[in-house]
Amino acid sequence: MQMIDKRLLNKKVIVTGGSRGIGAGIVKRLVNEGAEIIIADIEEEQAKKLIEDLNTKKINFVKTNLSEEDEIIKLFEFAKNHWGTVDILVNNAGIEDGFTLSNQSYEKYRNTMKVNLDAPFLCSKYALPLLEKSKSGRIIMISSIQGIRGYKGNISYNTAKGGLINMTRVLAVELAEKNILVNSVAPGFINTNMSIMKDGNLEWDTDWFKDVYLKYEKLPMARYGNPDDVAGAVFFFCSEDSKYVTGQTLLVDGGVSATF
């Protein structure tokens, strides 16, 4: 059995999009490390099930439509009233669209950008006064390997994830004097609901994936990752082990980026 040292004991953490997938993996890891968590998500039933499964009183759920600024403001008002401070913000929430330039409507483009890029900006902005009260404030962005490479057919998602990586750098420089560290994690192929394609097939079961990534050794570890793999990287940035690290992006991708 893995021994947990509770290295985040009583740390106050907000995880956006924490009800499922990578977000749920992050919540599980951080609560096991002793953190108190607010899940900000629109998926209420999934969040409640996660809290029930973890059997803990250290998690609160705030139903939040992260595409709406007023709901983000209410989220941080709740955090202020409930805790008075925030130690760690994990900007994890994201949606994927799968459209190319020619078939992407501006409305759908903007909707993806609102959740994937605007929301991390707004959450970071409204978290700032609470993070300043912490002696070890952290902002962690969940980007993607798609934010550092060209990838056909996902224009708004890729653009937003690339923007998150540069937002990480900018905020790291801007907030260093406030002792707030800002880093990002860029997952590769992770086994979540977002890896299910429109036709219902898993991405890594398709012929094109096998040809491009396995046959030509573009995925050196030859397997997909799991939310726990990403959660471990997030924990590093939450912990004192990263106290002299800011403005960095850690790729959790099984070696894909090493083949670029």
Cite the ranges covered by each PLM segment.
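Active-site loop immediately N-terminal to the catalytic Tyr-X3-Lys motif
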Residues: S102, R149-I155, E177-K178, A222, ...
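Short C-terminal tail/terminal secondary-structure segment
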Residues: Q2-I4, R149, F235, T246-F260
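Substrate-binding pocket helix/loop in short-chain dehydrogenase/reductase
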Residues: T100-L101, S105-R110, K215
